[in-house]
Amino acid sequence: MRAIGYNSYGGIDKLQILEVESPKPKRHEVAVKVSAISINPVDLKKMRGGFKPITSIKKFPIIIACDFSGEIVEIGNDVGAFKVGDKVFGMQDILFNGSAAEKITISQKYISLAPNNF
């Protein structure tokens, strides 16, 4: 699966297209086929190593971008508020990998249903 990320801390010149494993949702997670992302100042700070002391990511590569929208393609066993096919948007926790990938997994508590005209 393709993603956009980096293999060392630095500026935007470190970004590259990565080949990463396609994630599977855990019990309280959904898998989302990502259709859009945004890059904001927090992402750039993370890229420069600004959250290194507190992040849960211990190895490279790191996928960029917190904000996303897309469609649920798989759900974990304990997900009740969403179903496959739902259009959603959300924000990945800054301490974990981001959303600049073809598919991501995320806890159901970090997403919302997208408006009908979305």
Model-found features: residue ranges?
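Residues that act as N-cap/strand-start positions at coil-to-secondary-structure junctions
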Residues: 14-19, 98
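Glycine-rich beta-strand-centered segment in the early N-terminal region that forms part
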Residues: 21-38, 51-95
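Cytochrome P450 core scaffold surrounding the K-helix E-X-X-R motif
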Residues: 42-48
